[in-house]
């Protein structure tokens, strides 16, 4: 007989699961520089109201993956720059869809404490 604790998820340690887990989507606070806390969630949303920088997140753990849903405000034409940990295909950062209220999805995978591989799915409708 296993102890009760052996099969119980914990909230204060990193764990691996053999079945799907679901978390809430955490809203990021819009500002000149947006710094996600990757300990807070895997999936995020962000409505940008100006040209912004998505800074290197805090609390990176290799193996974490998720999405950041980025929405242009009602004005649009907003741009997004990226911190040095963000890595994209061919070394080129993607350009957001600039239409007012456009939605792009940034999919990411944390490789290490200083490297995040990401891909932008543009203009999702």
Labelled PLM ranges:
Residues 1-26:
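Fibrous stalk/shaft segments of extracellular and virion attachment machinery
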Residues 3-7, 46-125:
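Acidic, glycine/polar-enriched metal-coordinating patches/loops
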Residues 10, 37-40, 59-62:
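Flexible, charged surface loops at secondary-structure boundaries
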Residues 12, 39-43, 103:
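Sequence-level motif detector for i,i+2 pairs with an aromatic at +2
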Residues 13, 32, 42, 52, ...:
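The right-handed parallel beta-helix/beta-solenoid scaffold, focusing on the short coil/turn
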Residues 23-42:
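Transition segment at domain starts
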């Amino acid at each position: 007989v296993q102890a009760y604790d052996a099969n119980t998820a914990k909230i204060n340690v990193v764990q691996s699961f053999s079945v799907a887990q679901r978390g809430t989507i955490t809203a990021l606070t819009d500002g000149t520089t947006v710094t996600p806390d990757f300990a807070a969630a895997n999936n995020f949303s962000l409505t940008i109201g100006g040209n912004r920088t998505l800074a290197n997140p805090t609390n990176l753990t290799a193996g974490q993956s998720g999405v950041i849903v980025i929405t242009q405000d009602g004005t649009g034409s907003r741009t997004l720059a990226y911190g040095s940990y963000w890595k994209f295909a061919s070394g080129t950062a993607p350009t957001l869809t600039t239409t007012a209220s456009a939605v792009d999805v940034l999919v990411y995978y944390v490789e290490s404490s200083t490297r995040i591989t990401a891909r932008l799915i543009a203009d999702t409708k």
